[in-house]
Swiss-Prot record:
The chain crosses the membrane at residues 34-54, 62-82, 219-239, 254-274, 588-608, 616-636, 662-682. It is an enzyme of class 7 (translocase). Part of the high-affinity ATP-driven potassium transport (or Kdp) system, which catalyzes the hydrolysis of ATP coupled with the electrogenic transport of potassium into the cytoplasm. This subunit is responsible for energy coupling to the transport system and for the release of the potassium ions to the cytoplasm. InterPro entries: ATPase_P-typ_cyto_dom_N, ATPase_P-typ_P_site, ATPase_P-typ_TM_dom_sf, ATPase_P-typ_transduc_dom_A_sf, HAD-like_sf, HAD_sf, P-type_ATPase_bsu_IA, P_typ_ATPase. SUPFAM superfamilies: Calcium ATPase, transduction domain A, Calcium ATPase, transmembrane domain M, HAD-like, Metal cation-transporting ATPase, ATP-binding domain N. ATP binds at residues 344, 348, 377-384, 395. It catalyses: K(+)(out) + ATP + H2O = K(+)(in) + ADP + phosphate + H(+). The system is composed of three essential subunits: KdpA, KdpB and KdpC. It is found in: Cell inner membrane. This is Potassium-transporting ATPase ATP-binding subunit. It comes from Salmonella schwarzengrund (strain CVM19633). The keyword Aminoacyl-tRNA synthetase does not apply. GO terms for cellular component: plasma membrane. Belongs to the cation transport ATPase (P-type) (TC 3.A.3) family. Type IA subfamily.
């Protein structure tokens, strides 16, 4: 991927984020974050108290109250800045996509063929169902499906990948995206969306959407933070009469400072930024998530359904051998296999044609001159072939051909059954060829398991994630490849219905399921899965059914998607732990300072040896504001992620962020107190 990655603190983004942070000071914007709204209210109150003291309306230290008020405003501004910076990074990514949209003219065809008469119309006038012709050098004017032709397409504006890709009719690579450029040849495209509904439009709207919906975990955490805020608010409110009864009432300024330092402002100020940054990191991996809910669900996934081809294996299955049935000549089998594959544009189909040509000099026949009827492969029939003259030739999976033979009154030979088993045991895929009700033999298709994939599955297993391989191969082939790849389970001879049933079965057990897909037949399963990553090269139906789209069309990306989701959840949990642990140190700083005059015995709690009550309170407030700024890089980049079990991750994070949350404030508050004393501000 060659798309330029944004630096964490781009100067342009910083300036815009500072501006947006000030704009977010309005009460309407603050009300969306209850914790920070309390800080905002405290800032307003202390500002009013400062003005009242300056004008002599009430007594008190205007300087001390003013400085407290200033740092409370900084606390709100820093939280706003964190959110604005995260949003700014997403909007910058959206702006780079806007540059792809160009006003152009399109050749709208009057009939669905490349030599039909064409009208030049503005691309904005194209509607769903319109047929357009694009040639080398043209920008594709709409999202659609290729219905004729084949061409090299530059998709770098969308995917960031500089290498061109092939888009052609009749396969899994028929989907094209508006805004990409044709480099060679021509395509006839059927537009699949109306203006404003293109994939590019949806990408832009998603990443720059102003009203980001909170995810379930965010809502649950927000409720916890509100509950803690209410508890501390009530506790702080009782301290004034308590201290007044002791003969020396604590000032409102000190009580506000105490409240702000005790409530979980750190995570409260960074919560939105973490969510926005999670979606931004997903986009950085070239994956478009339709919502933060999808990213969060990726972090909770515990079952991965992985297509064998392209994910676990290299995906370039090639015909390697013809194994004829008893009494059948190998050349006869090769000839029938080649005829059945003439209209098969898949890599496997082309390899069968080539192998027959190489082995027996069987030249590829002209499809048009045969006057034959081609039978395409479907997920239901699981076979394809040709009807020519009085011959009915089919090739397909073992079970599909067996049903076909038996339905035509034939018998499936035992020797072919044995050949199928032998091929499958070697990890190859057997395809059976039949003419009428007579089985001619087996074609062996070989694929290679990706290097390092077994180790990745072992890491996922450590994390408690179950891996399930999905394949159309028979059970023996599937078992051999599953054992070699190291997956936990497999689904052989998979149909769309079987995939859907498997997902529902796992969900009924309370598990969250993730899968990838690219075809229209994957759409029901994608719609059912909790995390559904559709390939950008896939069909429009698949992209609409999924809740994420992988711009690189790399099925292995599903593992990275889960990692990003888990990193976002870990970041949120780690900073929550750090924020709550912070309160302990601030308690030791402010409580003795606030009540030292009323209850001198509380000086025993001044374990940090802070210079004076005022410096202690001011140091805690300053630290409370600055820690948000220091944690912004962590919130945006995410905590360090390692593939560990849930219990191991919990122990690790408690040590780092729990203990760190206790120790860092003691050090930070003491350092600030020393600096204030040296500067004569204590």
């Amino acid at each position: 991927m060659s798309r330029k990655q944004l630096a964490l603190f781009e100067p342009v983004l910083l300036v815009q984020a500072l501006t947006d942070a000030v704009k977010k000071l309005s009460p309407r914007a603050q009300w969306r974050n209850p914790v920070m709204f309390v800080v905002w209210a405290g800032s307003v109150l202390t500002t009013l108290l400062t003005l009242a003291m300056v004008t002599g309306q009430i007594t008190g230290s205007a300087l001390f109250t003013g400085v407290i008020s200033l740092w409370l405003w900084f606390t709100v501004l820093f939280a706003n800045f964190a959110e604005a910076l995260a949003e700014g990074r997403s909007k910058a990514q959206a702006n780079s996509l806007k540059g792809v949209k160009k006003t152009a003219f399109a050749r709208r065809l009057r009939a669905p063929r490349h030599d039909a008469q064409a009208d030049n119309v503005p691309a904005a006038e194209l509607r769903k169902g319109d047929i357009v012709l694009v040639k080398a050098g043209d920008i594709i004017p709409c999202d659609g499906e290729v219905i004729e032709g084949g061409a090299s397409v530059d998709e770098s504006a969308i995917t960031g990948e500089s290498a061109p890709v092939i888009r052609e009719s009749g396969g899994d690579f028929a989907s094209v995206t508006g805004g990409t450029r044709i480099l060679s040849d021509w395509l006839v495209i059927a537009c699949s969306v109306n203006p404003g509904e293109t994939f590019l439009d949806r990408m832009i709207a998603m990443v720059e959407g102003a009203q980001r919906r909170k995810t379930p975990n965010e809502i649950a955490l927000t409720i916890l933070l509100i509950a803690l805020t209410i508890v501390f608010l009530l506790a702080t409110a009782t301290l004034w009469p308590f201290s007044a009864w002791g003969g020396n009432a604590v000032s409102v300024t000190v009580l506000v400072a105490l409240l702000v330092c005790l409530i979980p402002t750190t995570i409260g100020g960074l919560l939105s930024a973490i969510g926005v940054a999670g979606m931004s990191r997903m986009l950085g991996a070239n994956v478009i998530a339709t919502s933060g809910r999808a990213v969060e669900a990726a972090g909770d996934v515990d079952v991965l359904l992985l297509d064998k081809t392209g994910t676990i294996t290299l995906g370039n299955r090639q015909a390697s051998d013809f194994i004829p049935a008893r009494g059948v000549d190998e050349r006869t089998l090769a000839d029938a296999a080649q005829l059945a594959s003439l209209a098969d544009e898949t890599p496997e189909g082309r390899s069968i044609v080539i192998l027959a040509k190489q082995r027996f000099n069987l030249r590829e026949r002209d499809v048009q001159s045969l006057h034959a009827t081609f039978v395409p492969f479907t997920a239901q029939s699981r076979m394809s072939g040709i009807n020519i003259d009085n011959r009915m030739i089919r090739k397909g999976s073992v079970d599909a051909i067996r049903r076909h033979v038996e339905s035509n009154g034939g018998h499936f030979p035992a020797d072919v059954e044995q050949n199928v088993e032998n091929v499958a045991r070697l990890g190859a895929t057997p395809l059976v060829v039949v003419e009428g009700a007579r089985v001619l033999g087996v074609i062996a298709l070989k694929d290679i398991v990706k290097g390092g994939i077994k180790e990745r599955f072992a890491q996922l297993r450590k994390m408690g994630i179950k891996t399930v391989m999905i394949t159309g191969d028979n059970r023996l082939t599937a078992a051999a490849i599953a054992a070699e790849a190291g997956v936990d389970d497999f689904l052989a001879e998979a149909t769309p219905e079987a995939k859907l049933a498997l997902i529902r079965q796992y969900q009924a057990e309370g598990r969250l399921v993730a899968m990838t897909g690219d075809g229209t037949n994957d759409a029901p399963a994608l719609a059912q899965a909790d995390v559904a990553v559709a390939m950008n090269s896939g069909t429009q139906a698949a992209k609409e059914a999924g809740n994420m789209v992988d711009l690189d069309s790399n099925p292995t990306k599903l593992i990275e998607v889960v990692h990003i989701g888990k990193q976002m959840l870990m970041t949120r949990g780690s900073l929550t732990t750090f924020s709550i642990a912070n309160d302990v140190a601030k308690y030791f700083a402010i409580i003795p300072a606030a009540f030292a005059a009323t209850y001198p015995q509380l000086n025993a709690l001044n374990v940090m040896g802070l210079h004076s009550p005022n410096s202690a309170i001011l140091s805690a407030v300053i630290f409370n504001a600055l820690i948000i700024i220091f944690l912004i890089p962590l919130a945006l980049k995410g905590v360090s992620y390692k593939p560990l079990s849930a219990s191991a991750m919990l122990r690790r994070n408690l040590w780092i962020y729990g203990l760190g949350g206790l120790v860092v404030p003691f050090i930070g508050i003491k350092v600030i107190d020393v600096l204030l004393t040296l500067l004569g501000l204590a």
